[in-house]
């Protein structure tokens, strides 16, 4: 399953300014395009559907719901994905491709259960204490689970080196979300905030469903060796803690500021600091170029050189090993 390295190499081999721009654009498309697609979709919906005409409290409820959906779906997926990624790497190396579907099924079950463990009590609090409409609460819950499944499916598509399809699936899901939101607001005259949340939820679910179908099309055989997957969680429990703490470190500063005077509380449930959260979002944008450059260099140079080094270690001479290592 070819990655993007071969295509990037062909682009950069032309050695022209236009080729460099094309290579950078292609790298951007397959690395950070999904994030920009979601952000762009929310901005377009806000602009064309009259988001600014909605009351401040309703806008705060929508912002808090979307913010929590993104942050906590990523945090919930983090502990399991590290171990599952290790398991996937091992079985791919051993060429036991029939063990991939059991890994997918176990991970899917664990992510949903773990997500519900935290989301259901939160939603109950949102409904009872925050007096938020039950339909709105349930839609937010479905959006959280759907995005959780999207992040989980991205693990398998990334291992398959199918970065282009990840971007394409996000584009399809968000295009459907924008179209549905436009239809609900402009044609059926439904509530703007709920229409946007419902449309985003359906868009995330569509992205997750297409991703799952693609994974199933890649790996058709199922060994049903589910215990082997669970055994890895016992062996590599430290990966669970490491990846959770790493992901938590990305947002812990936000959580700290949510306890300061900058915080805003919506519906006695959602707590966030809009000023600081916006500042960290803008700061994140300044680092996107490094992400693109890193992925490009890994895809174009690291994989092939690491493969050559591994082959030299297995059956090469000492000189071959040293030469491969120095590269």
Predicted regions and their residues:
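Membrane-interface junctions at transmembrane-helix termini in multi-pass inner-membrane proteins
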Residues: 148-168
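Small-residue-rich midsections of specific transmembrane alpha-helices
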Residues: 63-89, 247, 251, 280-303
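Alpha-helical transmembrane segments of multi-pass membrane proteins
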Residues: 67-72, 109-113, 121-153, 327
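Hydrophobic alpha-helical transmembrane segments
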Residues: 169-216
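Transmembrane helical elements of multi-pass membrane transporters/channels
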Residues: 199-299
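Specific pore-lining/lateral-gate transmembrane helices of multi-pass inner-membrane transport
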Residues: 94-104, 277-327
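C-terminal transmembrane helix end/exit motif
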Residues: 1-20, 155-159, 185, 202-226
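N-terminal membrane topogenesis motif
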Residues: 1-43, 60-61, 227-239, 324-327
């Amino acid at each position: 399953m070819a990655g993007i390295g071969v295509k990037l190499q062909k682009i950069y081999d032309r050695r022209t300014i236009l080729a460099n721009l094309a290579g950078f654009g292609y790298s951007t498309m397959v690395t950070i395009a999904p994030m920009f697609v979601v952000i762009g979709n929310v901005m377009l919906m806000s602009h064309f559907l009259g988001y600014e005409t909605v009351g401040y409290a309703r806008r705060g409820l929508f912002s808090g719901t979307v913010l929590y959906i993104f942050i906590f779906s990523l945090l919930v997926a983090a502990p399991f994905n590290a171990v599952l990624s290790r398991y996937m790497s091992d079985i791919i190396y051993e060429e036991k491709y029939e063990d991939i579907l059991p890994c997918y099924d176990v991970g899917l079950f664990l992510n949903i259960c773990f997500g519900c463990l935290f989301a259901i009590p939160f939603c109950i609090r949102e409904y009872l204490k925050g007096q938020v409409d039950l339909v709105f609460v349930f839609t937010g819950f479905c959006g959280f689970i759907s995005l959780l499944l999207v992040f989980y499916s991205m693990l398998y598509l990334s291992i398959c080196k199918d970065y282009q399809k990840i971007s394409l699936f996000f584009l399809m899901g968000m295009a459907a979300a924008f179209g549905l939101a436009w239809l609900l607001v402009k044609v059926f005259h439904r509530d703007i905030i709920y229409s946007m949340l419902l449309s985003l939820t359906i868009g995330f679910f569509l992205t997750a469903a297409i991703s799952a179908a693609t994974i199933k099309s890649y790996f058709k055989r199922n060994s049903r060796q589910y215990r082997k997957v669970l055994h890895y969680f016992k062996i590599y429990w430290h990966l669970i803690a490491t990846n959770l703490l790493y992901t938590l470190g990305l947002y812990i500063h936000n959580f700290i500021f949510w306890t300061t005077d900058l915080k805003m509380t919506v519906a006695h449930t959602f707590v966030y600091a809009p000023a600081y959260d916006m500042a960290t979002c803008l700061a994140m944008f300044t680092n996107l170029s490094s992400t693109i450059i890193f992925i490009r260099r890994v895809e174009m140079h690291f994989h092939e050189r690491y493969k050559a080094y591994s082959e030299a270690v297995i059956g090469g001479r000492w000189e071959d090993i040293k030469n491969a290592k120095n590269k």
